[in-house]
């Protein structure tokens, strides 16, 4: 592994870890940063699958007490059974739409301009959601009904558009549907587990010919870096939301999206050429 490749792996692994669970779109940031670093092609596709697994492992590790509690209680405890049912219900819409439209969306929408527009629009929606009166009807994830889970699962499908943010859509959707900020955030984290693992397994099998043994050091380093930075991001977000709203992330999305659009409009960066590279 040469120094340039090492640099790209460290940057992309850190970007994935930091952005995967913040409501600012990890896919959008990966598209932008990968284009700037000229890291594309089949190797990059395989690399992205691996680093996403590193990020999701961080959430599994962080919430392992809750996971063990659910697994242990599944045979007899109604709370564990209801929580598992809600996760499956919320996961189902993404499975259907992902299988049907993932390739089409990747072909036509995975470009920096789509990301920029989605960042701005998502930021505006996030600001609106935070400023409206928030009536809490579900204070804890264990109190969710199946209808709450289904609505959040449908909203999660919006994240198939790069720049929207899976965590952003599920968290803000949860707030709009009456979940407390803590419940919406925790359910978003738990929903990420089957969603991201399912997507990674599906993509990994579909593009299995892209994985080469010679890339193992690159993949391993990216996996570890993504895990470390995702752990930092998850713990930081859980502490942050205890006393803050998501408005900070909304303004960041808007500013970042407008910056990308400005560089495109004034010709400072040829994003069309970058996306095609």
UniProtKB/Swiss-Prot annotation:
Its main location: membrane. It is found in: Cell inner membrane. The chain crosses the membrane at residues 43-63, 87-107, 109-129, 183-203, 214-234, 254-274. Keywords: Antibiotic resistance, Cell inner membrane, Cell membrane, Cell shape, Cell wall biogenesis/degradation, Hydrolase, Membrane, Peptidoglycan synthesis, Transmembrane, Transmembrane helix. One of its GO terms (biological process) is regulation of cell shape. The keyword Cell wall biogenesis/degradation applies. It is a multi-pass membrane protein. It is an enzyme of class 3 (hydrolase). GO terms for cellular component: plasma membrane. It holds the Pfam family BacA. Its EC number is 3.6.1.27. The keyword Coiled coil does not apply. One of its GO terms (molecular function) is undecaprenyl-diphosphatase activity. It catalyses: di-trans,octa-cis-undecaprenyl diphosphate + H2O = di-trans,octa-cis-undecaprenyl phosphate + phosphate + H(+). Bacitracin is thought to be involved in the inhibition of peptidoglycan synthesis by sequestering undecaprenyl diphosphate, thereby reducing the pool of lipid carrier available. Catalyzes the dephosphorylation of undecaprenyl diphosphate (UPP). Confers resistance to bacitracin. Belongs to the UppP family. HAMAP family: Undec_diphosphatase (MF_01006). This is Undecaprenyl-diphosphatase 2. It comes from Pseudomonas fluorescens (strain Pf0-1).
């Amino acid at each position: 592994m040469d120094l340039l490749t090492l640099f790209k792996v460290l940057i992309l692994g850190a970007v994935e870890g930091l952005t995967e669970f913040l409501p600012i779109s990890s896919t959008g940031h990966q598209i932008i940063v990968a284009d700037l670093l000229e890291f594309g092609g089949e190797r990059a596709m395989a690399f992205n699958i691996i680093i996403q697994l590193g990020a999701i492992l961080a959430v599994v590790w962080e919430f392992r007490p809750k996971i063990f509690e659910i697994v242990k209680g599944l045979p007899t405890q109604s709370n564990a059974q209801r929580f598992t049912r809600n996760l499956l219900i919320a996961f189902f819409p993404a499975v259907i739409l992902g299988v049907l439209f993932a390739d089409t969306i990747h072909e036509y929408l995975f470009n920096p301009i789509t990301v920029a527009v989605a960042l701005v629009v998502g930021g505006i929606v996030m600001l609106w959601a935070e400023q409206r009166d928030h009536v809490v009807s579900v204070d804890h994830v264990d109190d969710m009904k199946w209808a709450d889970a289904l609505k959040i699962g449908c909203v999660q499908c919006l994240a198939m558009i790069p720049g929207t943010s899976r965590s952003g859509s599920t968290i803000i959707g949860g707030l709009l549907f009456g979940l407390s900020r803590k419940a919406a955030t925790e359910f978003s984290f738990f929903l990420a587990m089957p969603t991201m693992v399912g997507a990674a397994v599906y993509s990994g099998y579909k593009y299995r010919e892209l994985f080469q043994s010679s890339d193992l050091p690159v993949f391993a380093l990216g996996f570890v870096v993504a895990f470390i930075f995702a752990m930092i991001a998850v713990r930081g977000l859980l502490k942050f939301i205890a006393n803050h709203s998501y408005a900070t992330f909304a303004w960041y999305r808007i500013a970042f999206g407008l910056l990308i659009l400005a560089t495109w409009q004034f010709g400072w960066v040829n994003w069309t050429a970058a996306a095609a590279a």
